[in-house]
């Protein structure tokens, strides 16, 4: 009986982390269809549509919120990551969008205020999308692609086709991941 109470307390304390992913996996995709589109407000209240980024290499960060410690860490490195992605290869332009699922406590859908606070806290310049449509998009995408949790990155090519997932933080996404997917995109164009 003495062990049950501490174990229950540990379970309760760790349950908010169940959506976070501590390991890493990367998967290249064999799809040829564009990703489903999403239109949702960003932290400034402006609607952003994912298909507007066609013609660029789009990196989408699927993120939770403050309750996910590794999500905080990832959000804090995105501006530097975006700069390194943009400066690596002049053959393409990189666009970056973050999809924020929850409020800081993980109890409700992320609002504009949550997205603005997240953006300011992380000192980011990219769009942070929020709201019911964003949460639905995250859940549908994770179900369809069997993605285990946050943070997760999706690299999308110039035609709007998903090229690769990078899930977790042990081997986080780097600028060269986008370059590799761009080269694979060019190779696929040559073969068709």
Feature map (PLM): residue ranges:
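Conserved helix-turn-beta segment immediately C-terminal to the redox Cys motif
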Residues: 56-57, 73-100
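Short, internal strand/loop/helix patches
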Residues: 97, 112-150
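Structural recognition of the beta-strand scaffold that forms the well-ordered cores
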Residues: 58-62, 95-100, 127-131, 152-155, ...
